[in-house]
Amino acid sequence: MYYSEKLEEEILDLPDGLLARYLRLTDLMLKFGSNLGLPHTKPLESGLFELRVKGKEGIARVFFCTKIGKKIIMLHSFIKKSQKTPKKELQIAKSRMKEVIKNDSF
């Protein structure tokens, strides 16, 4: 499940190699659960996780959280351009996660 249609479109617009890897990893998450472990998923803080997508075109990150019933909600994505995750990108994911927790429609 996606936080918004816009986010789903952004993810589907990833370069082909990154998109293929993303789809493979999300398929594994649906089959085995959201915690695939490193190098695929990494817990960040208080229920926020990152899906680590690597391909020939670069590195993408997709932040996600889970809700009761094992529902996985993709919150935010970006193409990584530096070693460290930009605080702005992390803040967007945290803000959206708070909204998801408060809103029962997800």
Language-model regions, residue ranges each:
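Residue-level signal for short, function-critical loop segments
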Residues: 78
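Hydrophobic/aromatic beta-strand elements that line small-molecule binding cavities or substrate pockets
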Residues: 62-63
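Basic, Lys/Arg-enriched alpha-helical interface segments
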Residues: 1-59, 68-72, 81-106
